[in-house]
UniProtKB/Swiss-Prot annotation:
Keywords: Cytoplasm, Protein biosynthesis
Protein name in UniProt: Ribosome-recycling factor
Assigned GO CC terms: cytoplasm; cytosol
Subcellular location: Cytoplasm
Top-level taxon of origin: Bacteria
Organism: Yersinia pestis
Broad class of where this protein is predominantly found: cytoplasm
Keyword Cytoplasm: yes
Pfam families reported for this sequence: RRF
NCBIfam families given in the database record: frr
Length: 185
């Protein structure tokens, strides 16, 4: 029973870490990355469809993304969706390819993005701590029902705390990498 609680906590902490990494991967750095356009939805036959499903996105050079739209009639809609997104990008169409140049980030914008990344990291840490609390509550319920001893309760809580510390270190490491990436000119 205790092993199941620990495994469940580990799986949930891993999901928290993945969610954090997914969030920060969408935050734009000075380099071109297809994940920058992940949040963009394009109106396609009356339905909001993710841009990734409608176009092939490749990195042309360090500051340019190239999109090849599968359905040529959607090119204008894709361009409009990119322009109206809050990313501050201005795509240009050249035949079948839409090029999206990424402007250089200003120092002020970099600092704002670092604040956003730090806030995301704190949210990730809070999520991991909530998983720890849930796991400890389950163990305490077992202790209350006399299904486990106090020694097992203590040992289990120590295991969950070690797991929590390990995942928080992973969040901090991902944060440090992203901050360095943002400040790298």
């Amino acid at each position: 029973m205790i092993n199941e609680i620990r495994k469940d906590a580990e799986v949930r902490m891993e999901k928290c870490l993945e969610a954090f990494q997914n969030h920060i991967s969408k935050i734009r750095t000075g380099r071109a990355s297809p994940s920058i356009l992940d949040g963009i939805q394009v109106e396609y036959y009356g339905t909001a469809t993710p841009l990734r499903q409608l176009a092939n996105i490749v990195v042309e050079d360090s500051r340019t993304l190239a999109l090849t739209v599968f359905d040529r009639s959607l090119s204008a809609a894709v361009e409009k969706a990119i322009m109206t997104s809050d990313l501050g990008l201005n795509p240009s169409s050249a035949g079948t390819v839409i090029r999206v140049p990424l402007p250089a980030l200003t120092e002020e914008r970099r600092k704002d993005l670092i604040k956003v990344v730090r806030a995301e990291a704190e949210q990730g840490r809070v999520s991991i701590r909530n998983v720890r609390r849930d796991a400890n509550d389950k163990v305490k319920a077992l202790l209350k029902d006399k299904e486990i001893s106090e020694d097992e309760d203590r040992r289990s809580q120590d295991d969950v705390q070690k797991l929590t510390d390990a995942y928080i270190k992973k969040v901090d490491a991902a944060l440090a990498v992203k901050e360095a990436e943002l400040m790298d000119f």
